[in-house]
């Protein structure tokens, strides 16, 4: 969010210099931290540890579906990589407008996170997650067809809001369902998929925009997200009643 506003009001050069200065400051502060010692624990090979994480995930139902749903929605539904094209060629709002577009999803996510502290989506968590991802796809389609800045900002803010709901539910599921000795392994597997899907999603968006155009590429991404939600809805109806608050108490 701050990056978008910095780009809008300070320009590209000042924003990049500010980021470099802040990163350098973080590096210095980390090096000033005192060293800590930890008790020795039995270590495993990385591949062996990841393999155990994959095996545990395969034994459950809600965990692999949660990871897969997020993976596909980010891989196909993300539009962040295409925002410069929309700002320049479609909305014609220039660098300042691009900053607003970049900030909109973060603003939507921030407002939603604050609301979730009062109204957590824990009852019928899986159904809520599917609805949130479906909303992400629908608002992606709305952004693709928007010719107005205010409507584009609203659509992007709502994608951030829906994504934040999905993230909260998914992260809670990944913390509650694995036993204590498997949480790190499951988190590592999830982190591997999340980090790779973000980069591959940007590549997919750029490749699709090159051959289909930015609007059709965004429509394709939103449609694929809705298709995955429909498939998940049909295959996981038995999970609709899941209450992750009760699972946490157990």
Spans of features found by a protein language model:
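Alpha-helical transmembrane-bundle signature of multi-pass membrane transport and export proteins
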Residues: 1-250
């Amino acid at each position: 969010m701050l990056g978008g506003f910095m780009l809008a009001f300070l320009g590209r050069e000042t924003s990049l210099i500010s980021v470099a200065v802040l990163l350098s400051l973080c590096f210095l502060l980390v090096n000033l931290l005192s060293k800590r010692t930890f008790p020795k624990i039995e270590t495993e090979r990385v591949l062996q540890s990841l393999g155990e994480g994959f095996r545990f995930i395969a034994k459950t139902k809600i965990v692999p579906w949660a990871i897969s749903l997020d993976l596909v929605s980010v891989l196909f539904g993300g539009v962040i990589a295409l925002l410069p094209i929309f700002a320049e060629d479609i909305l014609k709002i220039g660098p300042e407008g691009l900053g607003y577009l970049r900030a909109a999803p973060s603003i939507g996510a921030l407002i939603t996170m604050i609301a979730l502290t009062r109204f957590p989506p824990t009852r019928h968590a899986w159904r809520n997650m599917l609805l949130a991802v479906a909303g992400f796809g629908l608002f992606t389609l709305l952004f693709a067809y928007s010719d107005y800045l205010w409507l584009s900002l609203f659509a992007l803010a709502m994608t951030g809001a829906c994504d934040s709901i999905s993230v909260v539910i998914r992260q809670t599921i990944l913390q509650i369902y694995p036993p204590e000795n498997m949480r790190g392994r499951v988190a590592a597997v999830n982190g591997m998929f999340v980090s790779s899907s973000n980069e591959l999603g940007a590549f997919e968006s750029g490749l699709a925009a090159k051959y289909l155009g930015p609007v059709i590429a965004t429509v394709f991404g939103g449609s694929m997200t809705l298709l995955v939600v429909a498939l998940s809805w049909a295959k996981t109806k038995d999970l609709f009643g899941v209450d992750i608050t009760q699972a946490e108490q157990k």
